[in-house]
């Protein structure tokens, strides 16, 4: 795919994994990464979700547009999408990580989108689910973002991985 959705997130995950390995960071809990190529049609993470998974973060993108809070300079944290609301406690945890680590963020609602996290929930996974990512303009068109949004999303992903499970 030529789109930043979702090559940007995959690149940030690979960068995070390299950092964890190179810096020999000890994570407070087991983290599994699942990269899907079917998220856009709702098949993403609807199978093979271990019953040991407690929290499920979809690391995707924040769609920019008229009526949206998201922008291309911050990390976008989703409160609700077309599938319904995301787990409030987990959303609050993400917001608190941003505040504590001085990560610029926006909270948004995406009425026309869903994510791998909502697909896992619909498939019956008993999880706390959340969604965040870099703010990206013109999803699936001539996409663009700002490096500040990439850094904010990377920093929240890193902070989340080092935080305890709620």
Regions found by a protein language model. Give the residues of each.
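Acidic/histidine-rich catalytic neighborhood of metal-dependent amide-processing enzymes
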Residues: 1-80, 113, 117
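Active-site-adjacent substrate-binding region
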Residues: 75-166
